[in-house]
Structures are given as C-alpha cells and as structure tokens.
Regions:
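Phosphate-binding/switch region of NTP-binding enzymes
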Residues: 36-37, 42, 47, 74-77, ...
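Conserved inter-motif catalytic segment of the P-loop NTP-binding fold
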Residues: 2-5, 19-20, 24-26, 30, ...
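Hydrophobic positions on the alpha1 helix immediately C-terminal to the Walker A/P-loop
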Residues: 48, 52
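Conserved beta-strand segments of alpha/beta enzyme cores
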Residues: 100-102, 199, 308
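C-terminal regions of RecA-like/P-loop NTPase motor modules
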Residues: 1-9, 41, 123-126, 164-165, ...
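Gly/Ala-rich phosphate-binding loop of Rossmann-like dinucleotide-binding domains
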Residues: 57
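Conserved hydrophobic/aromatic pocket- or pore-lining residues that grip, position, or stack substrates
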Residues: 29, 37, 53, 76, ...
Length: 326
C-alpha cells in the first residue's frame, strides 16, 4: 500500500518578507537559531554559559558586543549537576537574578530534544535563551546521535523552535577524543549537529596559561567570524578578559599561542615613539598588518597606551608623546 501523497506547495520568493538577523551577542550567538558551544570536559563551557545567563538575568552584558536592553528569562537544563548544591551556588557566585533563571522539572520524566515541554516552556515564560547542557543527555532513549538522519531531524525541530519564538538555543557539547581532527569532527557525534547550527564556539585551555580559557568561533553562517575571546577562572570566580590572540588550532593542539598580539602591538608603538612624536595612522596600520596584528588589536594597544589621534590636513596622525611617559 502506497503512503499518502504529500501535497505540493510552492513558495514564491517575491512573497517572502526579508528580515535581518537579530543578535544576542554579535557575531557569536544569534536569536532564532542554534548555537553550539563545545569543548573538552572541565574546560569551562558550563562556567561560561552560567555567567552569560547571570548577566542576561540582570539585563547586563558580558561582552561589549552583546545587545541586552533589559533582564530576560533564561531556561537552563542540565543533566550533569545538582540544582541545589552546584548550579544555584554557581549562579549566585556569578551574581544572577535567580528569579529569571528557569528549569523544566524533570523529576517525573526526563527531558529530550523532542519533548513538547520545550515549546510549552518557551511559550509560557517568553525566555530569550534556552540552554541544554550537555546536549548528549537530551537525545532521548531511542536516538543515536551518530546517525546523520536522526541528528538532522532532531536539530531541525529545535531550529524551528528557535525561529518561532526568536530565542537563542545553546547546545553545550563535549568533544570526542579524536586528537588531531578538525573541530567539526571532534564535536557531538554526527556532523549534522555541526551543519545545522549557524554558529559554533570552541572553548578550551590555553597552553602555558592554566587559569585562562579561550573562546574561538569555528563556524559562522551569518556574519564574519568573531575575534577570539578569553576568560579567567580562579578561586575568586570568573573574570571576562575580552579579545585574545589565539587560533582554534592552538587550542585544539595544546600549542602555546604565538607572542600575544596585543603586547606585540604595544611594543611596536613604543619603538616608534623612541624615534618620532607623530606618525600618520595609515602608516601604523600598514606596519601592524605586516606583523600580523589586526586593526582591532592595534586600536586596543593605542587605547591602553593613552595615544591620541589628531587630524591634520585631512589626514589622521597618532601622537606618541604619551607612550614616552609610560
């Protein structure tokens, strides 16, 4: 017996209304899409997302590129940590408004990615962020995440929820142990998880810096790749460091990053200041580019050294006197 025929429906692109992507954290976490945050166990993924959640609960920004106007509800599901003895103390340490951090009760039945309670919770709470940590625990008993078709169907359903409710869905995943492989293939089982997500962030240790963790974007379908970031873990808690010069290969391979580009940029400016008081900005940018220093890093070095820009005859110059006084 043949199955029921599916009705053909045609969509004319002229009838589709164009929309801009909205961002929670540009260009790392979009609204209405899936974002994967992956890394080895113990490397700080959960600490990062809990601190993001804490900031959002108070209407604050972790990073200057975040767009947070007011406190928002965050749904955080975890299968690895106790709510009372681990999750809440960590949220309190991060300064969260725990009234805004919500959890779907799994005491009667474990939650899965296909569970209708996910949509019910989004509709009821208006949460702008949903976090599943780790995603491996929310597959459901009958799903094999290494089967491409099953992974694709499951993530498409989650993606549809994100789009319908314009929330950011974050999937936290452990890396596998296939050392030397690309990050996409060291992720969460089927490559289809990686394929459906619009943004993928790698969180990992930095060789030679035991208390610092890097955040490197390894996939972005919606914008240019974001600059790598970093945060510090210590006995006193979490501290956001912002921009950091490191690559995904250095994180994955346990390779110490090349000379810190910010320090390299500051040293270049100090050496310039020894021979001149003022240099045209374009010349400085060209010098930095030859040394592999990005414009953004150079601007950060300029700010830290207290250098001022001055316009002369329609050209911009950097005054280096401040560098000599440091």
């Amino acid at each position: 017996m043949e199955g029921q025929k599916t009705e053909l429906k045609i969509i004319r692109m002229s009838e589709v209304e164009s929309q801009e992507v909205k961002w929670l954290w540009y260009p790392f976490i979009p609204y209405g899409k899936l974002t994967i945050i992956q890394g080895d166990p113990g490397d700080g993924k959960t600490t990062l997302v809990l601190n993001i959640a804490a900031k959002l609960s108070k209407g604050e920004c972790l990073d200057s590129d975040m767009d947070v106007q007011e406190p928002v509800n965050v749904i955080y599901q975890t299968a690895e940590d106790g709510l009372a003895d681990t999750v809440k103390p960590r949220l309190e340490l991060a300064g969260a408004d725990c009234e805004k951090i919500l959890v779907i009760d799994e005491s009667d039945k474990s939650l899965s990615m296909a569970d209708e309670r996910l949509e019910e919770a989004l509709a009821k709470t208006g949460a702008k962020v949903l976090i599943l940590d780790p995603i491996q625990a929310y597959l459901g008993g009958g799903m094999d995440m290494n089967r491409a078709n099953e992974a694709r169907d499951m993530t498409k359903k989650l993606g549809a929820l994100a789009e319908k409710y314009q929330c950011a869905i974050l999937l936290i995943g452990h890396m596998n142990k296939a050392s030397g492989n690309k990050a996409a293939y060291r992720g969460m089982g089927s490559i289809d998880f990686f394929a459906v997500a619009k943004s993928v962030l790698l969180v990992g240790r930095i060789e030679g810096e035991p208390n610092i963790r890097a955040v490197v974007q390894i996939k972005n379908n919606l914008a240019a790749f974001g600059h790598p970031k970093a945060f510090m873990l210590s006995e006193t808690g979490f501290r956001w460091l912002g921009d950091y010069e490191i690559t995904a290969d250095e994180v994955l391979g346990g390779i110490a990053p090349k000379a810190n580009k910010l320090e390299q940029a500051k040293q270049m400016l100090r050496e310039l200041a020894e021979t001149t008081n003022m240099v045209q900005s374009n010349e400085i940018f060209e010098m930095a580019d030859k040394q592999g220093i990005s414009k953004r890093t150079l601007e950060n070095a300029k700010k830290e050294l207290g250098i001022q820009a001055k316009k002369i005859n329609n050209s911009w110059y950097w005054e280096l006197d401040a560098v000599k006084q440091r």
